[in-house]
C-alpha cells in the first residue's frame, strides 16, 4: 500500500473555502506539559523528548521557564546548545531578570507574556493595563536590543476585549521588531467558531505572525487550533498526549494527523508518534485514556464482528488511517460482538485452523465466556477454548470402532 493510501482523505474539504494553511508547530510539552500537577521531568528525559521532537520535524520546541530554578535554566541551556534543526524557545515574564535568564540560555526565541484581561489585571496583577503593557514593552525592547527573537504573548486573550488586543499588538509591532504575537485561550473557553473569529480579527490588523495556544477544558483544543490555522494563525502550540494545566492542551499526535489527513501537510514524521506518546506516558506517569485519539490503547482495536470481518479484507473500511502511519499496531479482539467470519480470520492469524463444526462450537463458547467474564477474551483464553473445542469434537472410542466396522 502506497504512502498516499495510508489514510482516507476528507473530500468534503474540497467544498470548503479557507485560507491555505501556512503553519509551524511549537511543541510546549517541556514547559506547559510539565505544569501538569505532579509532573517533573529530569534533564535526561527532557533531552530525550527534545531529540524526538526535532527528529520528527517540529519547528519550535519550548524547552522551559528558566527562572523557575537553576536546574531548569541548566536544562533549557543544554537543549538550546544541542544543535537541533528545531528552534528553541523559553518562557519569560515581562521582567528584565527573566529576559536575562533567556539570554543566558542561548535560546532562539523568548516568549514574553502578560495578561490584558480585566480578570487578570484586577485579581492577579492588581495593576492597570497601561502599567502591564509598559512592562511588556520594556522587556521586549530589552530582549530585541540583545538580539533575541520575541514572541509577545497575551495570556487569557480569549477573555480580553478584541479592540484591546488589536491596539496592544499594533503598538508592539510598530515600536519593536517582534516575530510573533500570541493568543492564549488560557481557560479553554473558545470553540472553533469563536476561535476563527478572534484570529481573523487579529490577522486583519497585524503583519506579524500569529500564534495560537489552546487549552482543552471543553475538549476542543485541537479543533480550536485547527480553526485558528484556517483563520491565519502561523504557529500552533501542542503537547504530547495533550498533557498540561488542568485538562491539558491541544495534543501533538492529533494535530499532526489532522494536518496530514485534512489538509495534506505531510512533512512531519508521524511514524514516531506512538513511541513518543509512550515515552511521555512513562516520564509523566500519566497514561492516556484507552480511547485517546491516535495513541490510545483502543485507537486501532476492533471487536465487532461486522467491523473485524471488513477490516480483514480492507482495513480502511473502519480505520481513518492505518496504525503504521503513527507507529501503532492493529489489535483484533475476540468478545461478545465477534461474529463467525471475524473469529475465523482472527484464529487463522494466530496459527489455528478449525473445521466449520469446531468454529460454530467455539463461537458459542466465546459468547458464554464473555457474558460470564463481562470482558473481551485474551489470546491465552482463546487458545484454551480452542483446545476445549478440539477435545470435545474428537470422536469417542465407540464412534471410532463404529467407523472401522
From Swiss-Prot:
InterPro entries: AIPM/Hcit_synth_CS, Aldolase_TIM, LeuA/HCS_post-cat, PYR_CT. It comes from Methanosarcina acetivorans (strain ATCC 35395 / DSM 2834 / JCM 12185 / C2A). PROSITE patterns: AIPM_HOMOCIT_SYNTH_1, AIPM_HOMOCIT_SYNTH_2, PYR_CT. Keywords: Transferase. Catalyzes the condensation of alpha-ketoglutarate and acetyl-CoA to form (R)-homocitrate. Can also catalyze the condensation of alpha-ketoadipate with acetyl-CoA to form (R)-homo(2)citrate, and the condensation of alpha-ketopimelate with acetyl-CoA to form (R)-homo(3)citrate. These reactions are part of the biosynthesis pathway of coenzyme B and biotin. It catalyses: acetyl-CoA + 2-oxoglutarate + H2O = (2R)-homocitrate + CoA + H(+); 2-oxoadipate + acetyl-CoA + H2O = (R)-dihomocitrate + CoA + H(+); 2-oxoheptanedioate + acetyl-CoA + H2O = (R)-trihomocitrate + CoA + H(+). One of its GO terms (biological process) is coenzyme B biosynthetic process. The keyword Signal does not apply. Belongs to the alpha-IPM synthase/homocitrate synthase family. Pathway: Organic acid metabolism; 2-oxosuberate biosynthesis. Its EC number is 2.3.3.14, 2.3.3.-. This is Homocitrate synthase AksA. Residues 23-274 form the Pyruvate carboxyltransferase domain. It comes from the Archaea. GO terms for molecular function: homocitrate synthase activity.
Amino acid at each position: 500500500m502506497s504512502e498516499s493510501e495510508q489514510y482516507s482523505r476528507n473530500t468534503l474539504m474540497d467544498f470548503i473555502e479557507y485560507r491555505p494553511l501556512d503553519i509551524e508547530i511549537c511543541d510546549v510539552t517541556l514547559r506547559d506539559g510539565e505544569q501538569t500537577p505532579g509532573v517533573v521531568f529530569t534533564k535526561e528525559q527532557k533531552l530525550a523528548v527534545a531529540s524526538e521532537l526535532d527528529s520528527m520535524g517540529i519547528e519550535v520546541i519550548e524547552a522551559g521557564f528558566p527562572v523557575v530554578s537553576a536546574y531548569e535554566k541548566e536544562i533549557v541551556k543544554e537543549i538550546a546548545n544541542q544543535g537541533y534543526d528545531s528552534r528553541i524557545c523559553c518562557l519569560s515574564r515581562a521582567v528584565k531578570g527573566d529576559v536575562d535568564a533567556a539570554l543566558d540560555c542561548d535560546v532562539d526565541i523568548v516568549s514574553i507574556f502578560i495578561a490584558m484581561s480585566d480578570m487578570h489585571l484586577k485579581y492577579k496583577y492588581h495593576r492597570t493595563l497601561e502599567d502591564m503593557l509598559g512592562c511588556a514593552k520594556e522587556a521586549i525592547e530589552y530582549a530585541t536590543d540583545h538580539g533575541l527573537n520575541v514572541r509577545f504573548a497575551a495570556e487569557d486573550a480569549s477573555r480580553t476585549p478584541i479592540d484591546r488586543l488589536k491596539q496592544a499588538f499594533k503598538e508592539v509591532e510598530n515600536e519593536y521588531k517582534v516575530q510573533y504575537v500570541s493568543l492564549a485561550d488560557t481557560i479553554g473557553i473558545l470553540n472553533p467558531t469563536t476561535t476563527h473569529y478572534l484570529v481573523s480579527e487579529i490577522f486583519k490588523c497585524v503583519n506579524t505572525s500569529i500564534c495560537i495556544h489552546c487549552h482543552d477544558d471543553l475538549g476542543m483544543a485541537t479543533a480550536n487550533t485547527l480553526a485558528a490555522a484556517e483563520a491565519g494563525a502561523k504557529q500552533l502550540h501542542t503537547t504530547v498526549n495533550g498533557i498540561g494545566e488542568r485538562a491539558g492542551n491541544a495534543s501533538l499526535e492529533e494535530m499532526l494527523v489532522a494536518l496530514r489527513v485534512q489538509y495534506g501537510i505531510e512533512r512531519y514524521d508521524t511514524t514516531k508518534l506512538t513511541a513518543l506518546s509512550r515515552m511521555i506516558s512513562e516520564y509523566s506517569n500519566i497514561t492516556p485514556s484507552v480511547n485517546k485519539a491516535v495513541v490510545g490503547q483502543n485507537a486501532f482495536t476492533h471487536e465487532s464482528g461486522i467491523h473485524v470481518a471488513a477490516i480483514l479484507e480492507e482495513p480502511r473500511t473502519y480505520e481513518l488511517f492505518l496504525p503504521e502511519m503513527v507507529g501503532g499496531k492493529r489489535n483484533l479482539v475476540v468478545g461478545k460482538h465477534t461474529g463467525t467470519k471475524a473469529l475465523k480470520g482472527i484464529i487463522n492469524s494466530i496459527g489455528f485452523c478449525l473445521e466449520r463444526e469446531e468454529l460454530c462450537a467455539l463461537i458459542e463458547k466465546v459468547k458464554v465466556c464473555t457474558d460470564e467474564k463481562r470482558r473481551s477474551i485474551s489470546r491465552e483464553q482463546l487458545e484454551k477454548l480452542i483446545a476445549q473445542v478440539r477435545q470435545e469434537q474428537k470422536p469417542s472410542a465407540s464412534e471410532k470402532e463404529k467407523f472401522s466396522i
